[in-house]
């Protein structure tokens, strides 16, 4: 639903990877052997409904977005995937119209800086949701631990 298969070649060898599209026509790509992008690099915006949402969930990477979907988090809200904390400036034009911005960012220095940058721009509209996965690096790690504990 959110991803596609991308086929590519390097030095005559054929490979495939998961592709996650961004708003500029590029893709974030992941495989067992490779993590990168097909330019241009930009944010990804997912709107599950035709009607406008007042809430947008923000994720650092698409694996965290997919983890949230698997956990049933933010299903009715719009979602913005930064695809790199360096893209926080590109996110601003997409986040302006939301009344609440729920941040599911990594529990590291880059995630904290990104959260502070968003709070500096949007103030009280920004909500830090990382307490949900406290003790984990990110939402994807939390999902993996949760799934492992349920086995």
Residue ranges of model-derived segments:
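Short, small/acidic-rich helices and loops at N termini and domain boundaries
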Residues: 1-10, 141-147
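Phosphate-handling DNA/RNA-contact segment within nucleic-acid enzymes
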Residues: 6-94
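TOPRIM fold recognition
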Residues: 54, 70-151
């Amino acid at each position: 639903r959110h991803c596609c298969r991308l086929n590519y070649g390097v030095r005559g060898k054929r490979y495939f990877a998961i592709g996650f599209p961004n708003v500029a026509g590029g893709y974030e790509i992941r495989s067992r052997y490779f993590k990168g992008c097909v330019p241009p690099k930009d944010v990804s915006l997912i709107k599950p409904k035709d009607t406008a949402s007042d809430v947008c969930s923000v994720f650092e990477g698409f694996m965290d977005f997919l983890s949230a979907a698997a956990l049933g988090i933010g299903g009715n809200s719009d979602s913005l995937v930064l695809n790199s904390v360096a893209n926080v400036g590109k996110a601003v034009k997409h986040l302006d119209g939301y009344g609440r911005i729920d941040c599911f960012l990594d529990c590291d220095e880059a995630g904290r800086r990104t959260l502070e940058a968003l709070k500096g721009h949007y103030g009280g509209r920004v909500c830090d949701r990382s307490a949900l996965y406290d003790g984990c690096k990110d939402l994807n790690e939390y999902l993996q631990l949760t799934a492992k504990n349920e086995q």
